[in-house]
């Protein structure tokens, strides 16, 4: 994100007991004035809200909410998201086509085939106008879980843009995932890759 000219600030939300580990993982980037670390909450939506409130102090117009388990963000994806919001979308997210045949299953019994042409695989980062997303989070009932920020826009029919996703935005959850992605993008020069996979602690 810091390599993209549209980025004015990066807010990293972490569990309070992981703050020191987050600072250590950042290395020299921790000294970058654009990087801010804040404590998250018990739920995903609490952590997103903490990040949005911290970002709101920057005065920046747009915000991208991203999943740290997808560490490799192509510059073109960021550019496409920014362009979609500037063109009038209320929200934008990268989407990949569904390439596998999908089956409806009841227990262990296949009941039907689902039309995959109307489906897509949602990725992050997801981009919004910062003041608008903050307002929606603040106004959302506290007892209703938010697992995906775009859903706050689906409920009122807002224009949500789907931009082309990227396989390099795969979600890393195991060491084998890291090895696969390292092999995929080795030699491109687009990402700064560590020689060894970092400890993976998805919370």
Locations of regions flagged by a protein language model:
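Short active-site oxyanion
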Residues: 7-11, 90, 167-169
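Residue-level signal for inorganic ion chemistry
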Residues: 51, 66-67, 97, 129, ...
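Hydrophobic packing residues within well-ordered alpha-helices of enzyme cores
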Residues: 22-26, 81, 102, 181
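SAM-dependent methyltransferases
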Residues: 148-150, 167-169, 175-203
């Amino acid at each position: 994100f810091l390599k993209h000219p549209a980025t004015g600030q990066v807010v990293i939300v972490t569990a309070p007991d992981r703050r020191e580990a987050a600072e250590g993982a950042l290395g020299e980037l921790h000294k970058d004035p654009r990087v801010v670390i804040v404590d998250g909450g018990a739920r995903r939506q609490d952590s997103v809200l903490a990040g949005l409130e911290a970002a709101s102090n920057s005065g920046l117009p747009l915000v991208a909410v991203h999943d740290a388990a997808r560490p490799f963000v192509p510059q073109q994806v960021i550019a496409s998201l920014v362009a979609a919001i500037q063109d009038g979308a209320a929200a934008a997210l990268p989407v990949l086509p569904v390439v596998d045949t999908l089956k409806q299953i009841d227990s262990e019994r296949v009941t039907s085939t689902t039309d995959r042409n109307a489906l897509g695989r949602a990725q992050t980062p997801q981009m919004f106008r910062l003041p608008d997303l903050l307002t929606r989070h603040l106004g959302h009932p506290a007892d209703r879980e938010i697992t995906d920020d775009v859903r706050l826009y689906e409920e009122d029919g807002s224009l949500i843009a789907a931009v082309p996703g990227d396989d390099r935005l795969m979600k890393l959850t195991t060491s084998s995932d890291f090895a696969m992605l390292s092999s995929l993008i080795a030699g491109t020069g687009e990402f700064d890759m560590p020689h060894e996979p970092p400890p993976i602690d998805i919370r």
